[in-house]
Amino acid sequence: MDTSGKQAEAMALLAEAERKVKNSQSFFSGLFGGSSKIEEACEIYARAANMFKMAKNWSAAGNAFCQAAQLHLQLQSKHDAATCFVDAGNAFKKADPQEAINCLMRAIEIYTDMGRFTIAAKHHISIAEIYETELVDVEKAIAHYEQSADYYKGEESNSSANKCLLKVAGYAAQLEQYQKAIDIYEQVGTSAMDSPLLKYSAKDYFFKAALCHFCIDMLNAKLAVQKYEELFPAFSDSRECKLMKKLLEAHEEQNVDSYTESVKEYDSISRLDQWLTTMLLRIKKTIQGDEEDLR
């Protein structure tokens, strides 16, 4: 694709849009429908933005979408303005993550003002993902996942809310905010128990909650396992519960080999992900004479 040609076309469209805006501000335009010129300018800015996208000039595309959004606001077209801010955010994602967040936040402001909380929640997730992958700021990612969960809950979209909360719990545990993680895992685990479709995953949430308890204190973990078995009898027969009991026993005996062996055995059937590996290593370090490795 001829990107330089697309770039030149986009620049020409920008100039045309700017002329329309200027003309709309003249005295005669004010008398004879300046707003239709603004509408035309909105359209031309959006065309320019798409042309910049084809030329892979993401910042220029983002800026052109922002110009269109501002004009839509001038015309009181809130929905169109929000759509343009989202388009701007998506373009900036490829060039300037912080600017992408700023644009998505502008869109969220408009959507919440209009009472469109489900769509606002979706864009909070997009912001959280930028903080996770591009800007690597876990605290801010957590805040946006929490906000998203709040909006979803308010709209009775509980399964979407729980997905966001599980992200929060995972990061909270990594940041050693164990009680926060435990509260979420227990809450999501309890609600999963009552659903025929989600029942099977309840054991995983109780397992994760028990590991967080273990990171705080062994007695805590022991009591938690008992509580989960009473609450959800199917947990007793799960491989996760059996592993917890073996780990508690190994910890009580301060037996590193037994601890490592139990983890290896579990891992041979259900591969440990990064999160579980981190938690299990933290617990292992509290056993005397540990050798730093799980396998």
UniProtKB/Swiss-Prot annotation:
Keyword annotations from UniProtKB, A to Z: Acetylation, Cell membrane, ER-Golgi transport, Membrane, Phosphoprotein, Protein transport, Transport
Recorded topology in the membrane: Peripheral membrane protein
A GO BP annotation: membrane fusion
Position of the signal peptide: none
Location in the cell: Cell membrane
Primary localisation category: membrane
Positions where N-acetylmethionine occurs in the chain: M1
A Gene Ontology term for the protein's cellular component: neuromuscular junction
GO MF entry, a single one: soluble NSF attachment protein activity
Phosphoserine modified-residue sites: S26, S29, S195
InterPro entries to which the protein is assigned, alphabetical: NSF_attach, TPR-like_helical_dom_sf
Subunit structure: Interacts with PRKCABP, and disrupts the interaction between GRIA2 and PRKCABP, leading to the internalization of GRIA2. Found in a complex with VAMP8. Component of a SNARE-like complex that contains at least ZW10, USE1L, RINT1, STX18 and NAPA/SNAP-alpha. Interacts with VTI1A. Interacts with STX12. Interacts with GNA12 (via N-terminus); the interaction promotes CDH5 localization to plasma membrane.
PANTHER family: ALPHA-SOLUBLE NSF ATTACHMENT PROTEIN, SOLUBLE NSF ATTACHMENT PROTEIN SNAP
Role, per record: Required for vesicular transport between the endoplasmic reticulum and the Golgi apparatus. Together with GNA12 promotes CDH5 localization to plasma membrane.
Protein family (similarity comment): Belongs to the SNAP family.
The name this protein goes by in its record: Alpha-soluble NSF attachment protein
Organism: Rattus norvegicus (Rat)
